[in-house]
Structures are given as C-alpha cells and as structure tokens.
Amino acid sequence: MSDKPKTDAAQSGNDYSKTLFLPQTEFPMRAGLPQREPELLKRWEEMDLYGKLRESARGRAKFVLHDGPPYANGNIHIGHALNKILKDVVTKSQQMLGFDSNYVPGWDCHGLPIEWKIEEENYRSKGKPKPNFKDSAAIIAFRKECRAYADKWLNVQREEFKRLGVIGDWDHPYATMNYAAEAQIARELMKFAANGTLYRGSKPVMWSVVEKTALAEAEVEYEDYTSDTVWVKFPVKTGDASTKDASVVIWTTTPWTLPGNRAISFSSKIAYGLYKVTDAPADNWAKTGDLLILADGLAESVFKQARVVAYEKVSDVGADVLKASECAHPLQGLAGGYEFTVPLLDGDHVTDDTGTGFVHTAPGHGREDFDIWMHNARALEARGISSVIPYTVDENGALTEQAPGFTGKRVINDKGEKGDANEAVIQALIARGALLARGKLKHQYPHSWRSKKPVIFRNTPQWFIAMDKDIVDDGVAKPGDTLRARALQAISVTQWVPPAGQNRINGMISGRPDWVISRQRAWGVPIAVFIKDKGDGSVEILQDEIVNQRIAEAFMQEGADAWYAEGAAERFLGDRAAEGWRKVDDILDVWFDSGSTHAFVLEDAQNFPGLAGIRRKVDGGADTVMYLEGSDQHRGWFHSSLLESCGTRGRAPYDVVLTHGFTLDEQGRKMSKSLGNTTDPAKVIASSGADILRLWVCATDYADDQRIGPEILKNVVETYRKLRNSIRWMLGTLHHYHRDEAVAFADMPELERLMLHQLAEQSATVRAAYAEFDYKTVVASLAAFMNTELSAFYFDIRKDTLYCDPPSSLARKAALTTIDIICDAILKWLAPVLSFTADEAWSMYRPDAEPSVHLTLFPLDLGEYRDDALAKKWTLIRAVRRVVTGALEVERAAKRIGSSLEASPMIYLPEAFMGDIFDVDWAEICITSNAMVEILRGNDTPPADAFRLPELADVAVVVERAQGTKCARSWKILSSVGSDAEYPDVSPRDAQALREWKALGGAAA
C-alpha cells in the first residue's frame, strides 16, 4: 500500500478517514534545525548532560579523547568544525559502546600569532613603539594583554564549538596559559634538564627575520621564490699533483652563505673529472685555460651555463684524491677574514642530479651542512682546522663582523624582502675572479606560515633536547636509551588510524634532528632554568630541586609572569643568588606547551577529577587514551607529545592516534578567502543546522581530504531529509503502539522476523564500524537500510496492515513491535552523528525513559534475531517481487493501471521454487489487491507477452486488472467487498476494524 489510504467517500457516501490508524506525531517534517538546535543545547546544559554521562558511566573502563588544543585566535573555520565534530562522534559512540568516554576541551594560548595581534592592534596601528621586553614592568604588561586576548577568543570559540553539538566539560576546559598548566610545563622542562638531554647549543635553525624568532618545522610552508644562483671556484691549494692549479666548482642558491663556508662536500659514489676550458669569450668569467673539477654527469650543463665554447676532460678525479685535497676560500684576501683552509668531506647527501656534484658547506646555514661538519669535527681539529661554527648572520638578517667585508649587509629586511647581501657577495666573487657563472632559479623555498615571508637558516644559540644522548635516570645513563629509541619503540605499540600514519611519523622521528625548543619572544612559558657559562661556549644548568620547587610554586600562584618580575632571579635562587647564575630569557616553543598537555590534564586529578585514575592498557589497565587531529599533526602535536612523554615517562601519551585530512572546495582546491571558496560553518549552521555539518563529516572518508560546497551540502540535506522522514514515520506509527501488547519474536510473521534479522546484521555492522572509527560505513549502512529496506520495502508493505487492520490483529501488533525495536536501535545508532535530531526524536519516542538518547547504550541483544535460513528464503522472494514490480511499472507507464492496488498479477514460477516459497502472500508482498501463482511443470511455458527480467528469466508475470469492488476504506479491489451487511462498502477485514474502532470509543489513537 504505497500511498496513504483515503476513503472513497464519493463512491460509498461514507468517510472512513478518521477510522484509519494513520501516523500521528509532533516531530515535524521540516526540521527547522537552526531554531530547534539551540533549544536542545539549552536543555542539555540545564540537565547537566555531561555530568549525567559521567555519573551513568562510573566504574566503566575509560576511553579518553584528549583534545588537541586549537589556537585561541579568531572564529572557527570549517577545518575546526570537521575536527571537533569527529571528536564528538568518537566520544559519544565510545560512551554508547559501553565506555566512560571523557572529553575535556582545551586551548593553545601562547605564541607568536597572539603577540603579532597585540603588537598590531595595540601598538603599530596606534603608532606606539613596541614594548621593551628587557623592562620587567613592560613585558609583564604585554603578557597580560596577550592573556586577555587569548581569553576573549577562547570564550568565543567555546560557544562556537558547543553550537556544533559537541558535548564536553565546557565549564572546566584546559588552557596552556592557566597557572597550573604553566607550572607543570616548567616542571616538564626541568625533567629534561635533570635527565641530561636539555642543552644550549649552536645550531642552524629556521629563522624568521620578520618575526625575530626561530621556527619549528611545523611552522614552515614552502612557496615559490626566485633565488640568485652562482657557480663558484674554490682553488685547490693542497692535494694531488694532478689537480694543481685546478678549482673545485660549487653551485648554490644562497650566495649570502658563502662567508660562512667552511667545507666542500662530495660523494665517493659520484664520478668526477678534471676539465680544461679550451675556448671561451674574452670577457667571460670562465677563462680559456681554467682547470675545473666537476661531476662528469654535470660538466656539460655547467659549461653551458658558464658560456664556455669548448672544453676537454683531462683526467678522472677519484674520491681518494678529493678526500686528500684542501681548497682556499674564494673570498681569501677580503678584509683578512678568509685565510682558513676549506677541506673536502665525503657526504651521503651529495647527488649529481643538479649543480656541480659538489656542495658548498656552511655549517651555520644548513642542517645537512651542520651534520657533516659535526660528524668530522674531531678529525678536522686533529688536522689543525678549527671546527668552531661562525655566527655570520644576526637576528635582523644582517651579516655580522664574522663575515668580514659584508658587515651590515642584509639577507632579508624587516619587511621580508630580499636585501643587498647576495649582490655584495657576488660582486666580491667577481672582483676575485672566483665567479664562474650566475643565474636565477624559481623554486620552492621555506616561508613562515604566519608572516608568509621567506625564512633563512642561521646559526644561533638555542635550547635543544637531544635525540641521541643516553638519558640519565637516577643518576645512571643506560647505553642506547635515547629519546629517539624510546619514541620509535612507542610508535610501534600505538594503534594508528589509518595505519599509514605509523610509517609517516616513524620516518619523521627516524630522521629528525635534535628538538629546538627555544623562542626569542615574550608570550609563553619561559625556559625556567639558571645557567653559568663554562668557557667553551657551552653552559652549565643549575640542578637544584629547592630552586625548581620555588619556581613551580610561584607559577602555580602567579603564573609564568613571576619569571619576569623585578628581582625574580634573587627570589628563586635564594641563598644561591651570589654564585653567578644567570636567568634564561628565552621562552618555550608552543609545541613543547601543547606536547605537555598530557601532564597537566590527564595526570591532574585535582583540576580534572573526571580523568582521575586513568590506567592505560600499557600499564596493565583497561583504559584508552586517543589523540585525534589532522594529518599535519604527525609533525606537530602528535610528534611533540610523543617526544615530551617519551623523554619524561618513557612511553607515548596515547594508545590510539586517529588522523583526518584537510577540507577542500568542491573542485578539490585549497580554500582561501582570496578565491572566495571558503565554507563558513556558522553560515551553514544558520541556514541548515549543525546536524547537516555533522552528517557531512561522517558521510565522507575523513582519512582523505574532504570536499564541501553548496552542491555537496545540497546532497547532504537530501540524505538528511530521507533519514528524517523515516524517523518521523516510525514515530507517527508508534503513536498507536502499546508496549504491553508487544508480540514475541517467535510469534511474529516471517516479514517481521526478516526485518529483525536485518536489524541484527545492521547491529553487527554499526557496532564494528563505530568501534573501528569508520563513520562513513555507519552512515552508508544506516542510510541504505532506512531508505531501501525500511521505507521502500518493509514500511511500504506494512502500511495497509498498520493503517487498516483491526487493533486486535496479530500482524499489526507484530509490525508495531518490530518498528518499536527498529526505532529504538536507529535513534541510538544515529545519535553520535545526528545528535540534535536523534535526541529530539528520542524525547518524543521515549519520554518516560532516559532524558537523552546520549545517556543510552547501543542495543546489545539483537543477535538473537539472526535467522540466516529465513534471510536466504526471502532473497528469492524479493527477487520474484522485483519481477512483479517491473511488470507493474510497465502497466502503469502504459496507463493501463494507476495504483498497484488496481492490479492482480499472475506470477509464473518454476516448480523448483515451490519448495522454498510456497506459502507467500504475494498480494501483500507486492502491494496489489490480489495475486495468483501458476506453477510451471514439465514443458509448461508462460504467455509469450509475459514480463521477465534477465537476471531471473525463469519467472514471468502477466498483469491483469483486479476484479471486484473497491473497498471504501483500504482502496483494495476485492470480491469480498459487500459481504458484511453492517459495512457493505468495505472488505470483511475493514468491517472488523470498524467494529473494534467503534468499541474503543471511535478513536484511532
């Protein structure tokens, strides 16, 4: 019965519409989510839903999703929405799977972006000078401005996240700027000082001239940039006789680093040769007679760049010859500063893909340069070559006095523009006859993700945590027990979702350098240690537990501002103030802050009592800690948290790490305001509701990059509409259900038992998908079940029974019982995804049960409904039904019938089918007024014009018009209409229904 029945009043004179048991519900067809959702949020808050969840789950194993802190700066964007919705789906589904699933939201509050905002809004825009951070009062005042700014945006974002339907401990979030957090961050740093891995060193770091700070890898983006390129001759001064008067040629895209050159790297795996220029233009930098050492595979391209007309190879140059050779610096003689020897070092990083086959090595300006220099430092010192790395560029991007002849020349200016250093160096090379060629190269170059300006590698005093130094525990260092070794081991015992995340972070940890944790800024947790210079460039760190305790207690009471107060050094050092200890002024990298959140959230029972007593599986317990962020956090929060926890606790802070992709527009492009292709979550919520965003998140494969835009959201809305209509129909139908009339499973008709079997299959699929964080499967499976199996099949078939059968009908009661069981399961399964819609429906479905669907568990006892034999039988029945439906469509298209109730199909079945489906009510299943079956035996054949489907060619159908009179109540055309004297215009079934309706007081309720 595909349409809602109306009585044929014109034919019979009787209006039976009020006697039908039609759906009745206050659950509206139009969702009105933008208006309804805030009401539900208010209800959740008033009932303290998060508190009730914790109370109901007391004693269960914990599943803690530890929130990766967003930055407290600006309104949330679609990436935030994706991330927070995913987290909420995790926590809600894990709670409903039977865990105590806590969620404490948090914020990252320190760092340069907020400093920039304060400087811009409170100083630059008003023409005021930037505060002098060496002045105690000034830096504390500035830090208070930063704190207020972060607090403002924390509160804005909190409301925006709540509007997404995210349930958490919003009244007690964590923030890295909270006093207790700052105190614990300082304590975590002190642990690295105590275990011997914290050190101050000289090392090239990525430096933002514009921002005046070192940058972590996660803070760098690669953009197109045009660099000056030079091919430079380094004269061989000692070595094999065959290379006398020759020059080693290097190629670089950073001429300004040449004053910092201390070596040349080559590869013993590359073939090199000695080449002679035999013809070149008179005014050329490459002269006739020049002897040049080059990689054989690159010689042709070098000579072409150098405008050499002709050249010849004189001889091969072996690795032993190169290793024994030493060069002079190409700037030798300039300001008396380049008279040192330049050795040749064998390095694995050298290739002959481009350049000359030799790498100009400036250990203060490149990571690989630094690594090969330090690897050879002891041997170089033995040869009388100083291994000291110069500081050739200062924080302003200007060359220093350690770059003689170029002091004050700028690599990059304060605006991030290219300075005059490159040209000055190039002209000096030309003047000394050391330049072979020059050019320009457009390539990918590192830029700060904040300022969008190019960065440089420069040698600076920074604070580091060693990756490969044996960690001291109780005064003893165990050989091989390094931070890198611990981290790699921890990665191997962590669950990564998707699994590819393991290889990604494993590769990053395997190859990463020591962790630079210092920044030269004002808004952050200070590197709260005291030091003394040791005279060799290194420092001694004060190890005094009493001093450390004073610092931590002060931070707990006053925040980290206490470090900058007047007299702070004397206050913390106490009776050690006269020993010459200096207070470090650098602050910690914000990645160290966020990497320490496990310490001041998951382990702080005083401030977060709901998280007290976590005992993870790694400790023999049953609790689980998950981290969930975008895939970029393999080098960000996952990475820093892993290093921090492994360095202080010997293990990862998490058991499961789940990553999602980035959000793109409908064409797969990165979103940007300039392109006008952004999707504002606030606008989507205002127009369609947060549940639409939630459905979009869960319907996509979050492991990959997701797309969103108007057309995609339109499809999501359509999917939602279908799901909502199914829910609405069930709620309306169950208006007539009384649970004390529930029918036992064994007494149900086959169709109901089939649907409960399918529900049991859904239960297994949905539970497994939720357990595996596979929300795309949850949505796809439920949508298919609700749209295809329920709405288009079961509900359609059972509408006649539900609307028209007498209240005493077993079939009707069984159908209502089945729909009740289905509705209960579906609302619970949808709750983590459609949190508002499911809870609104639940309040109407079970007003006498739990006050929120989120306080329930997923159904556990559906497995008892499995009946694989019945399902197999109905696979055949439904195949036959498809043939009948196809035949009806042909008749409808030809306008020979209107409704399927006007038809009486003749179904021709092979004899082999009858053993399985002999007892089927085909009229009921096919929603026709009547149906006949004819068994084809032996050589019997159906009429030639019978309808068939290729996939079931043994079945044929001929559609005839139904014979009889149209029932004024059910619309069925039956010969039995008129057989009941009291109700002559309806069928006997409908007559009985009318009598029972009348006995009930004339109400279909």
Curated annotation (Swiss-Prot):
<comment type="function">
    <text>Catalyzes the attachment of isoleucine to tRNA(Ile). As IleRS can inadvertently accommodate and process structurally similar amino acids such as valine, to avoid such errors it has two additional distinct tRNA(Ile)-dependent editing activities. One activity is designated as 'pretransfer' editing and involves the hydrolysis of activated Val-AMP. The other activity is designated 'posttransfer' editing and involves deacylation of mischarged Val-tRNA(Ile).</text>
</comment>
<dbReference type="InterPro" id="IPR033708">
    <property type="entry name" value="Anticodon_Ile_BEm"/>
</dbReference>
<dbReference type="InterPro" id="IPR013155">
    <property type="entry name" value="M/V/L/I-tRNA-synth_anticd-bd"/>
</dbReference>
<protein>
    <recommendedName>
        <fullName>Isoleucine--tRNA ligase</fullName>
        <ecNumber>6.1.1.5</ecNumber>
    </recommendedName>
</protein>
<dbReference type="InterPro" id="IPR009080">
    <property type="entry name" value="tRNAsynth_Ia_anticodon-bd"/>
</dbReference>
<feature type="short sequence motif" description="'KMSKS' region">
    <location>
        <begin position="670"/>
        <end position="674"/>
    </location>
</feature>
<keyword id="KW-0067">ATP-binding</keyword>
<dbReference type="InterPro" id="IPR001412">
    <property type="entry name" value="aa-tRNA-synth_I_CS"/>
</dbReference>
<dbReference type="GO" id="GO:0000049">
    <property type="term" value="F:tRNA binding"/>
</dbReference>
<keyword id="KW-0648">Protein biosynthesis</keyword>
<dbReference type="GO" id="GO:0004822">
    <property type="term" value="F:isoleucine-tRNA ligase activity"/>
</dbReference>
<feature type="binding site">
    <location>
        <position position="673"/>
    </location>
    <ligand>
        <name>ATP</name>
    </ligand>
</feature>
<comment type="subunit">
    <text>Monomer.</text>
</comment>
<dbReference type="InterPro" id="IPR050081">
    <property type="entry name" value="Ile-tRNA_ligase"/>
</dbReference>
<dbReference type="InterPro" id="IPR002301">
    <property type="entry name" value="Ile-tRNA-ligase"/>
</dbReference>
<keyword id="KW-0547">Nucleotide-binding</keyword>
<dbReference type="GO" id="GO:0005829">
    <property type="term" value="C:cytosol"/>
</dbReference>
<feature type="binding site">
    <location>
        <position position="629"/>
    </location>
    <ligand>
        <name>L-isoleucyl-5'-AMP</name>
    </ligand>
</feature>
<keyword id="KW-0963">Cytoplasm</keyword>
<dbReference type="InterPro" id="IPR014729">
    <property type="entry name" value="Rossmann-like_a/b/a_fold"/>
</dbReference>
<keyword id="KW-0436">Ligase</keyword>
<dbReference type="GO" id="GO:0005524">
    <property type="term" value="F:ATP binding"/>
</dbReference>
<dbReference type="GO" id="GO:0006428">
    <property type="term" value="P:isoleucyl-tRNA aminoacylation"/>
</dbReference>
<keyword id="KW-0030">Aminoacyl-tRNA synthetase</keyword>
<comment type="similarity">
    <text>Belongs to the class-I aminoacyl-tRNA synthetase family. IleS type 1 subfamily.</text>
</comment>
<dbReference type="InterPro" id="IPR009008">
    <property type="entry name" value="Val/Leu/Ile-tRNA-synth_edit"/>
</dbReference>
<feature type="short sequence motif" description="'HIGH' region">
    <location>
        <begin position="70"/>
        <end position="80"/>
    </location>
</feature>
<dbReference type="Pfam" id="PF00133">
    <property type="entry name" value="tRNA-synt_1"/>
</dbReference>
<dbReference type="InterPro" id="IPR023585">
    <property type="entry name" value="Ile-tRNA-ligase_type1"/>
</dbReference>
<dbReference type="Pfam" id="PF08264">
    <property type="entry name" value="Anticodon_1"/>
</dbReference>
<dbReference type="GO" id="GO:0002161">
    <property type="term" value="F:aminoacyl-tRNA deacylase activity"/>
</dbReference>
<dbReference type="InterPro" id="IPR002300">
    <property type="entry name" value="aa-tRNA-synth_Ia"/>
</dbReference>
